[in-house]
Amino acid sequence: MSYTVIYAGTFDPMTNGHLDIIERASELFGQVIVAVAKNPSKQPLFSLEERTALVRQSCAHLANVQAVGFSGLLADFAKQHQAKALVRGIRGSDDIEYEIQLAQLNDKLSGRLDTVFLPPSVTWRYLSSTMVREIYRHQGDVAQFVPNAVLCALKEKE
């Protein structure tokens, strides 16, 4: 399909699970905008600029993917970029109720914005940024869970 979709998150840090969803979305849609969110209620490991750069580096092999930092309402960001839909990853039943509420809210706020749910590949179903941060904070090896650009950035923080 030749239209633009948005995959949004804080990506703190970006994981191989995120990359899996982005790669699959890039095969399905004409353009994928990875919207890297500034969330004032969280204390990020990386700044918005760093997270956006890490997503760009991790997705450099995908010609139809771009990373853009943003703050504010996702529905407004989607309108500004003329996106037809949002892409959301759903790991399991715990995510479904929240994600459906979020999808309905974004649709209502935007006037018309569909949400496409993609389950992660089985390999990454259990993975989250929170888990990666916890492993990292306890000096564990996160190499198998994050793209190389993220791994290098984490090592620089040590």
From Swiss-Prot:
Compartments where located: Cytoplasm
The reaction(s) this protein catalyses: (R)-4'-phosphopantetheine + ATP + H(+) = 3'-dephospho-CoA + diphosphate
GO cellular component, one term: cytoplasm
EC top class named in words: transferase
Record keywords, A-Z: ATP-binding, Coenzyme A biosynthesis, Cytoplasm, Magnesium, Nucleotide-binding, Nucleotidyltransferase, Transferase
Enzyme Commission designation: 2.7.7.3
GO biological process: coenzyme A biosynthetic process
GO MF term list: ATP binding; pantetheine-phosphate adenylyltransferase activity
Highest rank taxon of the organism: Bacteria
Annotated binding of substrate, by residue: 10, 42, 74, 88
Site (Transition state stabilizer): 18
Pfam family, one: CTP_transf_like
Gene3D superfamilies: HUPs
UniProt cross-references to HAMAP family, sorted A to Z: PPAT_bact
Role according to the record: Reversibly transfers an adenylyl group from ATP to 4'-phosphopantetheine, yielding dephospho-CoA (dPCoA) and pyrophosphate.
Protein name: Phosphopantetheine adenylyltransferase
Source organism: Actinobacillus pleuropneumoniae serotype 3 (strain JL03)
